[in-house]
Regions:
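Active-site nucleophile loop of the alpha/beta-hydrolase fold
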Residues: 124-137
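Short, surface-exposed "cap/lid" segments of acyl-processing enzymes
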Residues: 1-56
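Flexible extramembrane linkers and terminal tails adjacent to transmembrane helices
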Residues: 84-86, 110-123
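Conserved alpha/beta-hydrolase fold motif
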Residues: 89-95, 127
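Catalytic nucleophile-loop/oxyanion-hole region of alpha/beta-hydrolase
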Residues: 53-85
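Short glycine-enriched nucleophile-adjacent loop
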Residues: 100-111
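Gly/Ser/Thr-rich loops at beta-strand to alpha-helix junctions
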Residues: 25-28, 93-100, 135
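Alpha-helical membrane-targeting segments
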Residues: 57-61, 135-144
Length: 144
């Protein structure tokens, strides 16, 4: 699994948008950083990571679940450390790698009431999907 990278503008506070970005399968951090740099220039704090190939298309969900948990745990920790626990939260899922993260968060109710990350779910103000309108399955995933 790739690392999780936090990037913040020089000035941020309780109302600064916090955007969690799950990158596409095969992305390099330098490519994903171009997107988060744009968000940072608009005044957003960002957290980014890329899910590994095996986890994306494994018939077992444990790797995808661990990736989603790790991303949300890092978001929770960063928001608390930065005094942004109540800031608006946006989730951005890019192509098949990112959309598998969304699928997993939804399947396991991670952000729902009673879910492991319900504290974050209460602050989600929007979700952005980039380049993955298809329902992800092991059969169509490699084609998307």
């Amino acid at each position: 699994m790739a690392g999780v990278v936090l990037d913040a503008p020089d000035v941020f506070g309780e109302t600064t948008p916090f955007v969690v970005v799950a990158g596409w399968l095969g992305a390099k951090d330098r490519n994903l950083k171009k997107y988060t740099d744009e968000l940072k220039a608009m005044g957003c704090c960002t957290l980014r990571s890329i899910q590994g190939s095996w986890d994306c298309f494994s018939p077992l969900s444990s790797g995808r679940r661990e990736f989603a948990r790790r991303l949300l745990t890092k978001a929770r920790e960063a928001r608390a450390t930065m005094g942004m626990s109540k800031s608006p939260l946006y989730l951005m899922f890019m192509s098949n790698g990112g959309c598998w993260a969304h699928c997993t968060m939804t399947q396991f109710g991670m952000l729902d009431s009673g879910g492991e990350f319900e504290d974050l779910g209460a602050h989600v103000k929007g979700k952005v999907f980039d380049s993955s309108p298809a329902k992800m399955t092991l059969r169509n995933g490699p084609k998307v």
